[in-house]
Amino acid sequence: MRALPGAGTVCDTAGVTERSRENRHPTGRGPRAGSVSAASRAVRHRRLAQHALSHNISDMNRSVPTDSQVSLDAIVGISDSDLMISQPYRLYVERLDPSRNMARYYAMSIEPNLFGDICLLRKWGRIGTKGQMMVHHFGQEEDAVRLFLDLLRQKRKRGYRPRPSLPKEKWPAEAEHESATSAPVPDPEGHLDLDEERNLDGEL
């Protein structure tokens, strides 16, 4: 706008009209094609970026517990059977001799650990005390069962017997295992008396 003496203010529309004319299509129907194509490219790039981002999030990090749409953390195919053993061997026996002030317990179990190994857990001590514990790791369940049966034979020969059934609340804290193996114990072939061949359990 410019002021004219004695004529008030007059709008200078010539420049605005000229710029509008330059930005319009030669036919006079709308903006030039160059400005339209630039805007279209910007929108297209933005949509492609959003699609790529959502695609990456969907393919990575899927986890049902943390997202109902399964958009985080892919699920690892591990079934419960991968960590199971064929027969859960468990044993709890005691050796009591009042004349010698002897009251000992011995517990064993075969269980898998989180890394897929088979473990033989042994726990022993005086009844009413925390006692000691030892864990043996095996790659095959058969090896763990073999040692379990060897130690069972040894304990029977030393006078260990299953504890008589008592109410649960009267059992010592160490009696966390059942009083007998969960499956019949087969008679292993050959002579496996550890008291004569070797002493793997000299602590008792």
UniProtKB/Swiss-Prot annotation:
SMART domains: WGR (SM00773)
CDD domains noted in UniProt: WGR_MMR_like
Pfam families: WGR
Region of interest (Disordered), residue spans: 1-37, 159-204
Membrane-spanning residues: none
Keyword annotations: Plasmid
Presence of keyword Chloroplast: no
SUPFAM superfamilies to which the protein is assigned, alphabetical: WGR domain-like (SSF142921)
InterPro entries: WGR_dom_sf, WGR_domain, YehF/YfeS-like_WGR
Bias (Low complexity): 28-37
Signal peptide: none
Biased composition (Basic and acidic residues): 166-179, 188-204
Entry protein name: Uncharacterized protein y4dW
Lineage, broadest ranks: Bacteria, Pseudomonadati, Pseudomonadota, Alphaproteobacteria, Hyphomicrobiales
